[in-house]
From Swiss-Prot:
This protein's name: Ribulose bisphosphate carboxylase large chain
UniProt-listed Enzyme Commission number(s): 4.1.1.39
Residues that coordinate or bind substrate: 113, 163, 167, 285, 317, 369
Gene name of the encoded protein: rbcL
Reported function: RuBisCO catalyzes two reactions: the carboxylation of D-ribulose 1,5-bisphosphate, the primary event in carbon dioxide fixation, as well as the oxidative fragmentation of the pentose substrate in the photorespiration process. Both reactions occur simultaneously and in competition at the same active site.
Length: 465
């Protein structure tokens, strides 16, 4: 067929409702809001075209390749209930479009220029189905849930953490003191805040040294393995790895990375280093709400969570359902399952558009953090289960008697909830009573209960089905 210059509708090439998806295809579900007058089929086809092989006009070099082999295809369109001007477009991408083991390349195609396309008023990537054949090109999490439990020798309960506050301004020695007090009081982990890197008031090397001293002192006194998430995030990949190397030399168990601001290339490099050198990797999702908060534009966090499991991380922040940050229960539990489980069935009631098989990729521990305190402990234990990290920053350091009593209060509350659950009690219904009973024999918990008895964050979640 000879080359014919000009512009033709995307749907003539890229809308293929008869297409049967392959096991090796990457499947995407986009929420599309087209400009007025743009038909659904044309808008869906435009998304498929602009995120794969297409451009705005026909080009003669199309004849030098097999478009049928490489093009993305919009294979199904369905309306969004309650939204007249929105629909879900399902797009299938052949695996050959993507570099092996590169989240960066996958996202550059699927959520690249197409999000600025003029024919669309808004576009949101709701979910991805990543085929096993592509998953197997990634290392994934450095260690995973079971290996972490074995390293820490901690089983049968959620892990407890605390973000050191104030997040900025402390000297390294005072910072290390707070770490020691929290770990000595009964927490498993303490944490650098996401924006603690290497600032004039506290350079990274000083912080690492004082935190390592705190860890070893707390371990010696409690007989438990302890950790502090040392944030290795830096301005360059080379500097990031240098910090991780120093953490390994200190013998600490875990480092941390801000994976969205740091970038997927840097994160994958750090995850590989962590597996090779026995370090756990905690992931913070700073900047996620810029990408996932709007309901009709951007990318849902479940996609960012899947991308993290590919790129690599042993923990990731995943909302709390009950605290100060965004997170509706069923949707949150949907992507928590996508982080932890080996096989997750399609379930639209939880926002899961595709069945996902992780083919034994290690799981990631979800971290509940943000505005939570001892009264939330029963709900958090019931919602997240044992394979989670519950992190209380202000809920530890805000205790009226200090940091160590704050840690004691949280540990007592957690142990009480786990014991009550194991005895068959209903945490959702009897939670407050369980905490009150425990506070009778723990003065630290009683004081915490009194301070935070009136604190609630009663705003509606934006992210709903």
């Amino acid at each position: 067929v000879g080359f014919k210059a000009g512009v033709k509708d995307y749907k003539l090439t890229y809308y293929t409702p008869e297409y049967e998806t392959k096991d090796t295809d990457i499947l995407a579900a986009f929420r599309v809001t087209p400009q007025p007058g743009v038909p659904a089929e044309e808008a869906g086809a435009a998304v498929a075209a602009e995120s794969s092989t297409g451009t705005w006009t026909t080009v003669w070099t199309d004849g030098l390749t097999s478009l049928d082999r490489y093009k993305g295809r919009c294979y199904h369109i369905e309306p969004v209930a309650g939204e007249e001007d929105q629909f879900i477009a399902y797009v299938a991408y052949p695996l050959d479009l993507f570099e092996e083991g590169s989240v960066t390349n996958m996202f550059t195609s699927i959520v690249g220029n197409v999000f600025g396309f003029k024919a669309l008023r808004a576009l949101r990537l709701e979910d991805l189905r990543i085929p096993p054949s592509y998953i197997k090109t990634f290392q994934g999490p450095p260690h995973g849930i079971q290996v972490e439990r074995d390293k820490l020798n901690k089983y049968g309960r959620p892990l407890l953490g605390c973000t050191i506050k104030p997040k900025l301004g402390l000297s390294a020695k005072n910072y290390g003191r707070a770490v020691y007090e929290c770990l000595r009081g009964g927490l498993d982990f303490t944490k650098d805040d996401e924006n603690v890197n290497s600032q004039p008031f506290m350079r990274w090397r000083d912080r690492f040294l004082f935190c390592a001293e705190a860890i070893y002192k707390a371990q010696a006194e409690t007989g438990e393995i302890k950790g502090h998430y040392l944030n290795a995030t830096a301005g360059t990949c080379e500097e990031m790895i240098k910090r991780a190397v120093f953490a390994r030399e200190l013998g600490v168990p875990i480092v941390m990375h801000d994976y969205l601001t740091g970038g997927f290339t840097a994160n994958t490099s750090l995850a590989h280093y962590c597996r090779d050198n026995g370090l756990l990797l905690h992931i913070h999702r700073a900047m996620h709400a810029v990408i996932d908060r709007q309901k009709n534009h951007g990318m849902h966090f479940r996609v960012l969570a899947k991308a993290l499991r590919l790129s690599g991380g042993d923990h990731i922040h995943a909302g709390t359902v009950v605290g100060k940050l965004e997170g509706e229960r069923e949707i949150t539990l949907g992507f928590v399952d996508l982080l932890r489980d080996d096989f997750v069935e399609k379930d639209r009631s939880r926002g899961i558009y595709f069945t996902q098989d992780w083919v034994s990729t290690p799981g990631v521990l979800p971290v509940a953090s943000g505005g939570i305190h001892v009264w939330h402990m029963p709900a958090l234990t019931e919602i997240f289960g044992d394979d989670s990290v519950l992190q209380f920053g202000g809920g530890t350091l805000g205790h009226p008697w200090g940091n160590a009593p704050g840690a004691v209060a949280n540990r007592v509350a957690l142990e009480a909830c786990v014991r009550a659950r194991n005895e068959g009690r209903d945490l959702a219904r009897e939670g407050n009573e369980i905490i009150r009973e425990a506070s009778k024999w723990s003065l630290e918990l009683a004081a915490a209960c009194e301070v935070w008895k009136e604190i609630k964050f009663n705003w509606q979640a934006v992210d709903t089905i």
